[in-house]
Design a protein with these regions (language model features):
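Von Willebrand factor type A / integrin I
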Residues: 1-33, 42, 51, 170-174, ...
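An amphipathic, basic-hydrophobic helix/alpha-beta surface used to engage anionic
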Residues: 1-131, 135, 177-180, 187-188, ...
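Short, flexible loop segments at the rims of nucleotide/cofactor-binding pockets, characterized by
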Residues: 58, 154-158, 181-182
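Short, glycine/charged-enriched secondary-structure capping and boundary segments
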Residues: 71-72, 95-97, 137-138, 193-195, ...
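Short amphipathic alpha-helical interaction patches enriched in hydrophobic/aromatic residues
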Residues: 89, 93, 149-153, 265
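Short, well-ordered alpha-helical scaffold segments within catalytic/effector domains
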Residues: 103, 107, 158-165, 254
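Short, electropositive alpha-helical surface patch
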Residues: 132-147, 259, 287
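Von Willebrand factor
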Residues: 141-176, 188-190, 210
């Protein structure tokens, strides 16, 4: 992709996702993802309605008037985006490819985070750690992340979620709010790794999928290629039995994936590329508020 084309795409994504963050997501994000708790700020004179449990008895005794402690939320969070860059994300039969939607969702979360004074870090992963972008604040940092998502070329096309979860635990010693963005087209079970990570971090899983992964169209002979392994074959989609078998495989796989998230106490949402991700994210944020 040419540099000028990348700049145009970055700007287009910024306009859309920054607007969403400012107008729709900022308040919901703040409510859904809490800070580290309440920290002491100052003392002031007692006012009618103040909680008597907040009275600072030492200061009250010194000045012979009641004073209360004032607390403020320790807001600043570290937000980590674990972004799947494997070969299966370069697929789309509807409005856009899965990678395009993942980029927009990640950018929306990132802008929401910096508007709440949170830091953002990113890990690109396949079946290995492809790139690590340490946490920072600011618009320039977000634009750099978007540019990397648009232009990054991974070394591997395969997926192993375990690798990125183990990496997260090794580089982030303090608690983070972590989003995993992937189609979760995985061949290896990652339940144990997710359970370990979720004990330390506030984990949220966002699955992006294409409608054709859920249901095959009846269009006769079709050439299909596994984007991660390169395996290629022709299938007869006019076979009702084949289509039903394919649909059952999808449903069974989704059931197993949801069980993995539930056993790990990980909030999650699944979004198709032909759906409005704004509605799905808002629903997720509201459920957490």
């Amino acid at each position: 992709m040419e540099t000028s084309e990348i700049i145009k795409k970055v700007r287009k994504i910024e306009i859309k996702t920054r607007g969403l963050s400012s107008n729709i997501f900022a308040g919901q994000y703040h409510s859904a993802f809490k800070g580290r708790g309440m920290a002491f700020s100052e003392v002031r004179e007692y006012q009618f309605g103040d909680d008597v449990r907040d009275i600072d008895w030492n200061v009250t005794a010194r000045f012979h008037r009641p004073y209360v402690k004032v607390f403020e939320e320790e807001r600043e969070l570290t937000v980590m985006l674990l972004i799947d860059v494997s070969g299966s994300l370069d697929f789309g039969t509807q409005k856009q490819m899965k990678r395009d939607m993942v980029t927009e969702i990640a950018a929306t979360i990132a802008f929401s985070a910096i508007q709440n004074n949170d830091k953002i870090g990113v890990v690109f992963f396949s079946d290995k750690i492809e790139k690590y972008i340490p946490r920072k604040k600011g618009r320039k940092h977000i634009l750099y992340i978007i540019r990397e998502m648009l232009d990054f070329q991974p070394e591997s096309k395969k997926t192993d979620v375990r690798q990125v979860l183990e990496f997260l635990s090794s580089v982030q010693k303090r608690r983070t709010t972590t989003f995993i963005l992937s189609d979760f087209y995985v061949r290896k079970d990652f339940l144990q790794s997710l359970q370990i990570a979720s004990r330390k971090h506030d984990m949220v899983a966002i699955q992006v999928y294409d409608q054709r992964a859920r249901e095959l169209p009846d269009v006769g002979l079709m050439r299909v290629v596994d984007a991660e392994t390169g395996f290629e074959q022709y299938i007869d989609t006019s076979s009702k039995r084949l289509r039903e078998s394919y649909r059952k495989y999808w449903m069974d796989r989704q059931t197993q994936l949801m069980e993995t998230f539930n056993k790990s106490n990980v909030d999650n949402v699944s979004i198709a590329t032909n759906e409005d991700f704004v509605k799905s994210l808002l629903m997720l944020f509201k459920q957490r508020s």
